[in-house]
Amino acid sequence: LTTIIPILLAVAFLTLLERKVLGYMQLRKGPNIVGPYGLLQPIADAVKLFIKEPLQPLTSSLALFIIAPTLALTLALMMWIPLPMPHPLINMNLSILFMLALSSLAVYAILWSGWASNSKYALIGALRAVAQTISYEVTLAIIILSILLMNGSFTLSTLITTQEYTWLIMPSWPLAMMWFISTIAETNRAPFDLTEGESELVSGFNVEYAGGPFALFFLAEYANIIMMNALTIILFLGAYNNSTFPEMYTANFMLKALLFTTFFLWIRASYPRFRYDQLMHLLWKNFLPLTLVMCMWHVTL
């Protein structure tokens, strides 16, 4: 509970931040009616979504239809367990592997939701999402492997000591760039949000969801965004952990995560969506060879 509630609160205010950032980038105010400066908007949205009647298509598979959003949110929250801030919830030896396994499992939630809706749009959206997530996980795994070679251990907590004197982004900035772009693709954000191409697929895999279940998907997506940014910070921009003031580490860490999250929103406001083939070309023809070469280079170091 100590992590779940703050994460959900962070997600709520991230939605507000996103609407504000996009608003100001389009020369308008964003939500500013509910509460001072629109601060109560996310709470109003949540209440509205959860008191709506959850619709369920007649032809859909009920069990999977309900399980998919709950699984998505559960996995999104479980990913936070091994993150050191500065101490993880559960200190695992193979925390990186745990996170990779969970992020691969998240594909199932998307696949089930699209398949159980029994709608063509949802199915196409889900298939796209699955292909995209699985593809980009390949580069993420290789980049993580390269970082672990410098770290010398599978535990995330040791990255803090590794980066005491210099950030890992310095020796491996091409990896950091590819990692950042891959995290955007992994979390299905613009310009990689092919799963919900409004012009062609209405809303993608969650097209048949309304009310509560839709809110769960929404929460899962944004929790994943914050989590991926937190992981980026841990891997490449390790905050300095001063043992006398551990609070400073958390503040430093969260400030960087906030900056990266704002960067995500900035990218969303700036760039148009990719075509599906461009997305796959970028990964299999550009990122994969590059990451493999970098990984080999790190092995030789």
Curated annotation (Swiss-Prot):
EC number in record: 7.1.1.2
Matches recorded under Pfam families: NADHdh
Membrane topology recorded in Swiss-Prot or TrEMBL: Multi-pass membrane protein
Residues annotated as transmembrane: 4-24, 62-82, 96-116, 140-160, 165-185, 216-236, 247-267, 279-299
Keyword Translocase: yes
Main location: mitochondrion
Catalytic activity of the protein: a ubiquinone + NADH + 5 H(+)(in) = a ubiquinol + NAD(+) + 4 H(+)(out)
Gene Ontology CC: mitochondrial inner membrane
Compartment(s): Mitochondrion inner membrane
Family matches, as InterPro entries: NADH_UbQ_OxRdtase_su1/FPO (IPR001694), NADH_UbQ_OxRdtase_su1_CS (IPR018086)
UniProt GO BP: aerobic respiration
Gene Ontology molecular-function annotations: NADH dehydrogenase (ubiquinone) activity
Family to which this protein belongs: Belongs to the complex I subunit 1 family.
Protein's recorded name: NADH-ubiquinone oxidoreductase chain 1
Source organism of this protein record: Nyctalus noctula (Noctule bat)
Lineage: Eukaryota, Metazoa, Chordata, Craniata, Vertebrata
Recorded name of the encoding gene: MT-ND1
